[in-house]
């Protein structure tokens, strides 16, 4: 075993069980693709993405860690977000929060 290595059982695994989730419709209004990583505070993603930003405050994509969702120009899709855990404080990104939620 390598330090930090995780050995996962085969089969399906439920991510973020018991955590509050929401669904939002997101449209890429820009002329370039936008990719959003699994742990990016969705409220602060690229301004070319059009959606209810107030509803997304304190949420991230409900996808496996280390993965991402790509929004092609002109594409509209429904995504699922999961509430941020831990201390529920956000620092960095676009600097729109910089503290507790």
Curated annotation (Swiss-Prot):
Q: Which CDD domains match?
A: Urease_beta (cd00407)
What's the catalysed reaction?
Answer: urea + 2 H2O + H(+) = hydrogencarbonate + 2 NH4(+)
Q: Which domain of life is it from?
A: Bacteria
For the biological process aspect of GO, one term held by this record is:
urea catabolic process
Record Pfam families: Urease_beta
Query: Pathway, per Swiss-Prot/TrEMBL?
Result: Nitrogen metabolism; urea degradation; CO(2) and NH(3) from urea (urease route): step 1/1
Query: Which Gene3D superfamilies does UniProt cross-reference here?
Result: Urease, beta subunit
The transmembrane segments are: none
MF terms (GO), sorted A to Z: urease activity
First-listed, main subcellular location of the protein, grouped into a coarse class: cytoplasm
For this UniProt record, the keywords arranged alphabetically read as follows: Cytoplasm, Hydrolase
Q: Name one GO cellular component term.
A: urease complex
Q: Does the keyword Cytoplasm apply?
A: yes
Q: Does the keyword Transmembrane apply?
A: no
Give the first-level EC class, as a single word: hydrolase
Instruction: Name the EC number(s).
Output: 3.5.1.5
Of which family is this protein a member? Belongs to the urease beta subunit family.
Q: Which NCBIfam families match?
A: PRK13203.1, urease_beta
Query: PANTHER family attached here?
Result: UREASE
Assembly and interactions? Heterotrimer of UreA (gamma), UreB (beta) and UreC (alpha) subunits. Three heterotrimers associate to form the active enzyme.
Q: Give the protein's recorded name.
A: Urease subunit beta
Q: Organism, per UniProt? A: Burkholderia pseudomallei (strain 668)
Q: Which gene encodes it?
A: ureB
